[in-house]
Amino acid sequence: MPTWLKVTIILIALFFALLVATIYMGYRAAMRLGEDAKTTGDEATAFAQGKESPACVDEAVARAVKCNKGDAFCLMRAQMFMMECLDHAKMPPDFCASVPAHNGFQIRNRWAADECARRGHPDDARCNQMLQTLQLHCSSKR
């Protein structure tokens, strides 16, 4: 068998091995994310019982700032927690009044940055992300 054919067969085998490994890892990540979503949703629903919406925001921000920078799964869990908690907590009538709509890029970013600084997390992208999630929630309630 010629050398070029051996090299080609080895490269094809390596390609398929990498393909199988990628599919397997993607499947495992999807299963983990599904389990995390259910667990986080259950935690948020339990947390929301007897509480008002601001408590949900405080807890979600606290969870987010504990995430390692760059840990997208942790931030997604914090966002899921906030959305689920806000859906089950009692919302005060004026809760969203001071939250700007999620349509003006500069306005929403400035508000989130100012609010994070007020909460003791200046220049923290994780806090900003949580408050932008709050803006989405409030925009959908208007």
Give the role of each language-model region.
Residues I23-A72:
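Immediate post-signal-peptide N-terminus of mature secreted/exported proteins
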Residues M1-I9, L33-E35:
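N-terminal positive-inside, membrane-proximal cytosolic segments immediately preceding the first
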Residues K6-R28:
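Hydrophobic membrane-insertion alpha-helices, especially the h-region
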Residues V7, F16-L19, T39, E59, ...:
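Alpha-helical protein-protein interaction elements
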Residues P2, R28-A30, M83, L131:
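Generic N-terminal initiation segments characterized by hydrophobic and/or small/turn-forming residues
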Residues P54-D58, A62-R142:
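Non-cytosolic head/periplasmic domains of membrane-anchored proteins
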